[in-house]
Amino acid sequence: MNIIEGKLNLDSNTKIAIINARFNHIITDRLVEGAKDAFLRHGGKEENLSLILVPGAFELPYALKKAIESKKFDAICCVGAVIRGSTPHFDYVSAETTKGIANVSLNHNIPVSFGVLTTDTIEQAIERAGSKAGNKGFEAMTTVIEMLNLSKEL
């Protein structure tokens, strides 16, 4: 059997953008740091990493679409944090953000990763942003690196 998989290394010219939803910035700043750490650990150069800031998770799909259309990046890592409150707002924002990122990703020929936390509590978000459950920003960047390299093999 022939196994095809993406490697976890970057060449020195690879350009990746992190799109960060600033809302819940105490969490999302940690996700960005995790994503940056993964980029550098896997061989990326800091000057080839861009950070695009948007107000909240709902704005991620639009910024993703514009970033892809700019043709400046080889891959894009989206991060954010949507934390459940006492209204249905969480359900709408998390669902539409997920659908929007998926739709943009599938309609363009560029790897995109989804590092948007959707948690019931702030404690769960903190756990996923660098404490007990690792850093999902780091994982999202690792995923997009692997998918970028896989796309070169397919």
From Swiss-Prot:
Its EC number is 2.5.1.78. It catalyses: (2S)-2-hydroxy-3-oxobutyl phosphate + 5-amino-6-(D-ribitylamino)uracil = 6,7-dimethyl-8-(1-D-ribityl)lumazine + phosphate + 2 H2O + H(+). It is an enzyme of class 2 (transferase). GO terms for molecular function: 6,7-dimethyl-8-ribityllumazine synthase activity. Keywords: Riboflavin biosynthesis, Transferase. 5-amino-6-(D-ribitylamino)uracil binds at F23, A57, F58, E59, A81, V82, I83, F114. It comes from the Bacteria. InterPro entries: LS (IPR034964), LS/RS (IPR002180), LS/RS_sf (IPR036467). GO terms for biological process: riboflavin biosynthetic process. Pathway: Cofactor biosynthesis; riboflavin biosynthesis; riboflavin from 2-hydroxy-3-oxobutyl phosphate and 5-amino-6-(D-ribitylamino)uracil: step 1/2. Belongs to the DMRL synthase family. This is 6,7-dimethyl-8-ribityllumazine synthase. The lineage of its organism: Bacteria, Pseudomonadati, Campylobacterota, Epsilonproteobacteria, Campylobacterales. The gene is ribH.
